[in-house]
């Protein structure tokens, strides 16, 4: 079992949990500190998992839920505003990998009048976006067959934690889909505050390991935001990174090890418990029909 970041086979058990009735083991690389599931052990490493099983396990059916639509609708303006600060000119073409219902693409389209394309393996979610007139594909390979050219922005929001090889996937995006002066935007759960441990989360990222993965995929970080939007005003549940292609991707920086990961997670979760107890309505912003106690 090799680490997807540094390739080391030295690891220790980081945590044992259960998710949707499945026992999960998370390992930590002893060399670089990355926290991950074994691809050999995880059912979520199978691509068919997302086409046929993922939504059914998580929400009992395959169709978009009110929670999905609400969270995506609240998240999209934040991401559009963040990316807008780094565009030299309005983006003409935008690709969203893991586009779900297409709400983020719809927001980009309305803001910049951009041509938008989405990748979504879930049939019902892809159909939902297509009904709004968004051009959608099941996989990047299907899009590549259409020879779409290059995009000014490629986003992957809550995607790379699900990928068996995030570095290879990001590298493929850089080489085949992103323009030379284009931007990459990724968002992942923050291991130091978010629950993170889920059947479908093959990798759990810290701010450090997210940046290292981007570096090894040939990207240069522009900004890394720790935030809770749209679920919390007090807890930095998410990490959002904007990056651009490195000037010379063949010369990758050396990998720096992440230290004291377990301790930082314990401190972060302790803060989370206090925030939830003392300021429940700020710690968690309610979803439609949800009451915060």
For each of these PLM feature ranges, what is it?
Residues 184-215:
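Short, glycine-/aromatic-enriched active-site segment of Class I SAM-dependent methyltransferases
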Residues 166, 195-197, 232-234, 252:
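Extended hydrophobic-aromatic, low-complexity segments
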Residues 1-157, 167-172, 207, 237-240, ...:
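Conserved N-terminal segment of class I S-adenosyl-L-methionine
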Residues 157-162, 187:
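Short catalytic micro-motifs in class I SAM-dependent methyltransferases
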Residues 11-18, 219-229:
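Conserved S-adenosyl-L-methionine
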Residues 167-183:
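A short glycine-rich, Lys/Arg-flanked "PGG" loop and its adjoining helix->strand segment in the class I
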Residues 122-123, 143, 191-192, 227-229:
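Conserved beta-strand edge residues that scaffold enzyme active sites
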